[in-house]
Curated annotation (Swiss-Prot):
Its cofactor is Mg(2+). CDD domains: YihA_EngB. GO terms for biological process: division septum assembly. InterPro entries: G_ENGB_dom, GTP-bd, GTP-bd_ribosome_bio_YsxC, P-loop_NTPase. Necessary for normal cell division and for the maintenance of normal septation. Mg(2+) binds at S38, T60. GO terms for cellular component: cytosol. It comes from Janthinobacterium sp. (strain Marseille). This is Probable GTP-binding protein EngB. GTP binds at residues 31-38, 58-62, 92-95, 159-162, 193-200. It comes from the Bacteria.
Amino acid sequence: MSLLWQARFFTTVNHLRDLPKTQVPEIAFAGRSNAGKSTAINILCNQKKLAFASKTPGRTQHINYFSIGGAHVGQHRKDETKVDEIRALLVDLPGYGYAEVSGSAKLHWQELLGDYVQRREQLAALVLIVDSRRPFTELDIQMLEWFAPTGKPIHCLLTKSDKLNRNDAANALRTARTILGSYVDENGQPFPFTAQMFSALKRSGLDEANDKIIELLGLNEAPQEESNGPAANDV
C-alpha cells in the first residue's frame, strides 16, 4: 500500500500568514484549471473525494493541505503536539488560468501562488499538472519561472494521456522534456525537472508518479520503529 493512501484533510488557508507551522516536507500540486489536478491527487491517494474537483474553473480558491501519517486529522489542528506525528504534507494549490472569476480574485491567487512557491521553506518539490493535449501555456511557463530559482525539483504530470495516440504521446513528452530541460542554473546545469505521461482514467503512469512523489518527499524508507526488514524493492 502506498504511503499516499494515508492522506487525510489537514487544513485550508487563504493567506500566507495562515500556513501551518509544521516542519515536515511538503510537495505542492499546481496546474491550469481543469488540467486534471484534483483528479490526479485523488487517484494517487486512492480516494474519490480527497481533493475537490470542480467543473467550474477557479472554484478551488484556497490552498488545501493533506497530511500523511499521524493521528486523526481533527486532533492535529487542536493539539499541536500531534503535529510531530505527521511525516509529510500534500498541498493542493488553486488552479490558474480561469476566466470566470473577478480580476481582484485572480490577482490575489496569483500573488498567493507566487509567494508560496518561492518562499515556503518546507516546500520540497512541485508537481506540475499539464494537459498532455495542449502545449505549456503562458501561465505554466510563469509557474516554472517562479519556481526555478529555488533550485528545487519539479515533476510534470502530462495528464489525460489516454486521449492521445502513441505518436502524439511521445511528441508531447519530448516537448515537455525539452521545455523543462531549457531551464539551467547560473553554472549552466539543468534544474532537476522531470516529466511523465499520466492518465487517471486508465491508471497509467500511476506507479511511476507515486514512486517519484515518495522519493521527492524523502519517504523512501519507513521510520526505524516500523521497519521489519528490507523493502520489496531491495530484494
